[in-house]
C-alpha cells in the first residue's frame, strides 16, 4: 500500500508585514512552514500506516526555493512519513491551484500510489481546490471534507464526513484522493527521537522536467495586497421609521 500525503510550504503569517504605502505584502521576513491544514493530512496518513501492514507513506510537495530548506524537510519527515519527494522549480514559486494540482498529479503518477491524502485547503490561499483538481486530473474518485477514516483495505477506503445536518459514510474504491478536514485528528508534536531520525530518511528532489510538467497558465496572479484601511464613519441613525430604514439601507450600499 503506497500512501502519498501532499503538503504545501507557506509563509508564517505572523511574520508577514503590510506596506502602508500601497497595501502590498512583504514576505521577506516570513519563514516557511508546513500549512496547518496539511499537518492533519500527514497525521492521517501516518495513522493509516499503523493500520495497514507494509504500508509506505511518502510526503510530496511542489514549490519554489522554500522546499530547499533542510529544516523544513526535517520537520515533515519527523512527523512520520517514510520518505519525501519535493518538486522544485521557479515556475512553482507562486503557483496557483490548477498549476499546483497538475504538478502534484504528475509527480504522484511518477512515484506510484494507492491513496493520496491532502488537507482541505492551504493556510495562505485556502482555495480548497487542489485536492479536488488532483482527483479530476488523475480521473480517480475524490472526496473532500473527510472528518474520520473508518477502515482501509487493499481496494477500499471507508470514511465519514460531516454535513450540515447529517453524517455521511462513504466507501471509496482505490486508488483515490481524499482531502481531510481539521476535525480528523490533532497532529502530534514530533519527539526528539523522531526529529533525529528524520535526517536519515530518503529525500528525492525532482524538477518540473522530471515529471514532464510544461503547463501554460491561462491567467496569472499580478499582485497580492491587504485591503485598504478606512476610518469608521460613526453614523448613528435614530428611530425605526421608514425614513430611518431607507437611510440605513443607503449607507449600507455605500460600503458594500
Swiss-Prot record:
InterPro entries: ET-Flavoprotein_bsu_CS, ETF_a/b_N, ETF_b, ETF_beta_N, FixA, Rossmann-like_a/b/a_fold. Pfam families: ETF (PF01012). SMART domains: ETF. One of its GO terms (molecular function) is electron transfer activity. Pathway: Amine and polyamine metabolism; carnitine metabolism. GO terms for biological process: carnitine metabolic process. Keywords: Electron transport, Transport. Belongs to the ETF beta-subunit/FixA family. Heterodimer of FixA and FixB. Required for anaerobic carnitine reduction. May bring reductant to CaiA. This is Protein FixA.
Amino acid at each position: 500500500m503506497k500512501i502519498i500525503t501532499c503538503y504545501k510550504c507557506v509563509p508564517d503569517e505572523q511574520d508577514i508585514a503590510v506596506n502602508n504605502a500601497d497595501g502590498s505584502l512583504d514576505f521577506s521576513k516570513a519563514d516557511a512552514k508546513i500549512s496547518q491544514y496539511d499537518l492533519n493530512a500527514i497525521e492521517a496518513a501516518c495513522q493509516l500506516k499503523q493500520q495497514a501492514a507494509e504500508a509506505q507513506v511518502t510526503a510530496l510537495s511542489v514549490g519554489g526555493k522554500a522546499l530547499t530548506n533542510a529544516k523544513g524537510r526535517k520537520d515533515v519527515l519527523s512527523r512520520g512519513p517514510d520518505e519525501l519527494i519535493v518538486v522544485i522549480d521557479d515556475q512553482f514559486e507562486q503557483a496557483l491551484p490548477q498549476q499546483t494540482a497538475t504538478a502534484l498529479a504528475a509527480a504522484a503518477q511518477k512515484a506510484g500510489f494507492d491513496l493520496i491524502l491532502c488537507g482541505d485547503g492551504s493556510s495562505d490561499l485556502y482555495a480548497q481546490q487542489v485536492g479536488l483538481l488532483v482527483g479530476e486530473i488523475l480521473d480517480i474518485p475524490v472526496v473532500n471534507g473527510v472528518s474520520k477514516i473508518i477502515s482501509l483495505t487493499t481496494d477500499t477506503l471507508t470514511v465519514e464526513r460531516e454535513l450540515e445536518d447529517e453524517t455521511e459514510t462513504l466507501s471509496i474504491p482505490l486508488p483515490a484522493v481524499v482531502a481531510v478536514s481539521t476535525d480528523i485528528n490533532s497532529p502530534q508534536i514530533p519527539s526528539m527521537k523522531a526529529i533525529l531520525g528524520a535526517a536519515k530518511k530518503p529525500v528525492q528532489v525532482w524538477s518540473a522536467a522530471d515529471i514532464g510538467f510544461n503547463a501554460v497558465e491561462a491567467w496569472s496572479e499580478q499582485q497580492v495586497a491587504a485591503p485598504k484601511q478606512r476610518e469608521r464613519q460613526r453614523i448613528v441613525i435614530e428611530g425605526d421609521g421608514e425614513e430611518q430604514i431607507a437611510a440605513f439601507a443607503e449607507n449600507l450600499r455605500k460600503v458594500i
